[in-house]
């Protein structure tokens, strides 16, 4: 008989359903019991295989055999054994990532450096995310740099302006929290400082009644792309103490220079390339090492020894691609079998050639042995910029001529113009006068006579000519002659005649060299049309000029050559007018020949020449040859 509690339980529908399922369903206790075991056995294997570089997938048959041998799995059915297999998408071998070909090599920690340098370099690379980290050990500078004694300087490149300020601020807080170092960050803009400054700038512009100074999306010069974090390992404690000399006498008070000054220069890529502080400090350290050796009565054996010492002090970032490019550049350089040390530019360097000798087919310096090399010019400019070599006004003009006119295997106009920009910027920083008449003439002349004259130099030439007109340059006779010669070399006849007309614009008389160059340039073209057009207005102006121009030998020869090109038969008719063949011509033909335009000009020239010879102002050709 069913007891009352059982009957009460059977009266509930849910309890009745549970009892029926327990009695009627198949026993699955073993499968339910083995499920956690299978998961516990398989999941660590799958996890280890997914994150490992080695293939740890076991053969399918071994896993099946292992499951069958297990006592707990003995009563399982065929369906349970098949469900124990690993799915197909888990049997795929995980991808293997190849090792990076360009491993970043962090700078090595110098000897006797503060303990904070090691973790600091690691933090700068991993947490701050700065690239191209370099380290300069400047503790040997004597006297020390203005930044502090025993200087160690690091450089890093930030990805953007925002990255620069955020990472620099975190770096200062990291030093304060982990190493108890109170570092200063010059140029750092705080999180809300930029917004505050821009708001003040907008308010100021609104009060002034103009908003044109506000650039949308810009910082308006508030940020510089450069944050300098610096601190000293000795802290801010400065102990003043009395100083005594070698004899024991009191010499004053002072604080001994102790500790190490650490400077971290964080810059954007553009700012770092613009300043190039590594090259500047490298030149300073090199010069200081040489001077200290010389003061002790010693010197480096050779340049290689000095470079080894510099390499141990300066660790610059290097990559495989950069090293390969440097090797290619070094292999492509020309090696000369003679010394070029005595061929430096000097203030007393003469002009390469007179301005009147540049009308040949090629410039004169191309026919002589190479006097200057473009690499030497570049090195000289770097010495002026980095070391501070003195520079005079004449040396400035010679450097510009050397940068533009020196022959080079790679005639890159862009590189030459960049050199000129650098030397002009250096001269302007030193307070030298650069925008005068001589500078305009030198720049235009050097560009026109450059072996790489092309579109880029033409663009720069047009800009210079525009500035020249705006400034109202008043050139002297020699400068006008140089401009005419340079334009004639490039066969730019419009600008050639424009330069020829410059003296009358400023109420100045032309010199005989101007007319001689004009006649000779036209004669060298062998163009009858150009010679006729030039003679019809140049010759009357020459004859009416006050003071008059004497037909001396160079001018006379050039004018005669130009007349011969304009009228090839004039010279023949003038000297052979009495021949029978010409006498037998009809009167109309004879008058036509006698009244030719340039035949009259040639007769006039010959008569003037004869008068000068009778007056003794000009020697005859026979007398000149005899002398």
Swiss-Prot record:
Keywords: Membrane, Mitochondrion, Mitochondrion inner membrane, Transit peptide
Region (Disordered): 336-355
Cell compartment(s), UniProt: Mitochondrion inner membrane
Transmembrane segments: none
Membrane topology annotation: Peripheral membrane protein
Biological-process GO terms, alphabetical: mitochondrial gene expression; mRNA stabilization
Record-linked Gene3D superfamilies: Beta Polymerase, domain 2
A GO term from the CC aspect: mitochondrial inner membrane
FT transit peptide: 1-51
Listed InterPro entries: Atp25, NT_sf
Family: Belongs to the ATP25 family.
Protein purpose: Probable mitochondrial mRNA stabilization factor.
Protein name as annotated: ATPase synthesis protein 25, mitochondrial
Upper taxonomic lineage: Eukaryota, Fungi, Dikarya, Ascomycota, Pezizomycotina
Encoding gene (name): ATP25
